[in-house]
């Protein structure tokens, strides 16, 4: 599965998803792209999942146009140590049937 890590997340996350083809926005040279343009680029390159900390993205885009799964990591901050506890949840989602559009990933009850 091809995954893209948004520029608002630590690139260190790549090590936790080595079973997948995983790239950062920086790896692809897509820094500072607007969300709509980023989603179009992802479609062209056959990416299937975007990992992001951008909680507004899910309200700003029409996901009928972009059949990409977006995992919105909803935690206190975007540091690796804060993200680490939700990595197993992300793996569960990736191993299941992901729907197109946003899915919030959080540890909050």
PLM feature spans:
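N-terminal first-folded block
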Residues: 2-45
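Acidic, metal-binding active-site segment of PIN/NYN-like and related structure-specific nucleases
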Residues: 42-63
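Short glycine-/acidic-enriched loop or helix-start segments at secondary-structure transitions
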Residues: 14-15, 60-62, 82
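Small/polar loops that bind or transfer phosphate-bearing groups
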Residues: 5, 51, 74
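C-terminal structural segments of small proteins and small subunits
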Residues: 69-108
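Short histidine/acidic/glycine/proline-rich micro-motifs that form metal-
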Residues: 28-29, 57, 76-78
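Short, glycine/charged-enriched secondary-structure capping and boundary segments
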Residues: 17-20, 38-39, 64-68, 85-86
């Amino acid at each position: 599965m091809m995954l893209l890590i948004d520029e608002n997340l630590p690139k260190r996350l790549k090590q936790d998803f080595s079973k997948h083809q995983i790239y950062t926005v920086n790896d692809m040279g897509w820094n500072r792209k607007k969300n709509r343009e980023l989603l179009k680029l992802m479609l062209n390159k056959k990416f299937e999942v975007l990992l992001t900390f951008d909680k507004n993205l899910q309200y700003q885009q029409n996901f009928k146009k972009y059949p990409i799964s977006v995992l919105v990591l909803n935690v206190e901050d975007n540091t690796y140590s804060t993200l680490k506890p939700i990595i197993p949840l992300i793996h569960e989602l990736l191993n299941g049937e992901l729907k197109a559009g946003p899915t919030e990933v959080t540890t909050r009850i």
